[in-house]
A protein has these predicted regions:
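Hydrophobic/aromatic-lined pockets within catalytic cores
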Residues: 107, 129-130, 218, 222
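Positively charged n-region of N-terminal signal peptides that target proteins for export
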Residues: 1-6
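An acidic, glycine-rich "communication" segment
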Residues: 35-36, 44-45, 118-194, 202-211
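Alpha-helical scaffolding within the catalytic cores
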Residues: 63-70, 92-98, 162-166
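Aromatic-Pro/Gly-enriched surface loop or interdomain linker
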Residues: 19-80, 84-87, 185-186, 192-224
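Short alpha-beta junction capping motif
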Residues: 28, 80-119
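Bacterial N-terminal signal peptides
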Residues: 7-17
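Extracellular/periplasmic catalytic domains that process cell-envelope and extracellular macromolecules
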Residues: 21-24, 73-77, 103-104, 161, ...
Length: 224
């Protein structure tokens, strides 16, 4: 009886473990920066995006995103950094060098302008890559044509200045290393529904475009 009980316990343990969700394969980290801008804006965005991607893509993202500082070696633990906010962005010389090394080594940075970042984030990234210029991505770029097809480029999620959304990129040796989404506000669309009260179809477009970015970076990146 003792042997049978032990075997039953082992079988039950195996059965339970077989239904346990797999450990997250990777995390999207939120980038903390200096200068006074609210790097912590849209706190529910990344968890909600992770949940959407885990349901709709063959992927397993940690739903609890870590926060990393621009100058920390910890950024090298995460293949994808997300940066957002409304205001000033400042990188010290050491932070700029750390970010440069990270991006050259294969890391990816998504900057989502939450409104008001543009005058600050461009000089900050110029400090990281003085030799590079942001290039507007054409609607034909693969990031718009992953699982979800966006024939006209970025969707407009949150209205501010009646301007069209634009996607800009920094390229290093033919690889898109930084995607800057401007006048779009994807992160607002990823927030909990009751935060901005965006229409559900608008939120779905935001999630779908976010999923495209994730799929492009991890599953289908091709810039050539």
């Amino acid at each position: 009886m003792k042997i049978l009980s032990t075997l039953s316990l082992i079988a039950l343990t195996i059965l339970i473990s077989s239904f346990s969700p797999p450990a997250p394969s990777f995390s999207i980290a939120l980038l903390k920066y200096n200068g006074g801008g609210d790097w912590y804006a849209n706190p529910t965005s990344l968890p909600n995006l992770a949940e959407f991607c885990n349901k709709n893509l063959d992927i397993n993202i940690n739903p609890d995103p870590p926060t990393v500082e621009a100058g920390s070696p910890e950024i090298f633990n995460y293949p994808f950094l997300h940066m957002t906010g409304h205001g000033n962005v400042v990188f010290s010389a050491d932070e700029a060098q750390n970010m440069r090394t990270y991006l050259q080594a294969g890391g990816f940075l998504h900057i989502d302008d939450n409104y008001g970042m543009d005058p600050y984030v461009r000089p900050a990234m110029k400090k990281v890559f003085p030799e590079l210029e942001f290039i507007e991505l054409p609607f034909s770029h693969p990031v718009f044509h992953q699982k979800y097809d966006f024939k006209n480029g970025l969707p407009k999620i949150h209205e501010h200045d009646n301007k069209s959304p634009q996607a800009f990129g920094l390229f290093w040796e033919g690889r898109l290393i930084c995607l800057y989404t401007f006048e779009c506000d994807l992160g607002d669309g990823w927030e909990d529904a009751d935060v901005h009260k965006d229409p559900e179809d608008t939120r779905q477009k935001a999630f779908q475009m976010g999923a495209n970015i994730i799929q492009y970076v991890f599953m289908g990146r091709s810039d050539l």
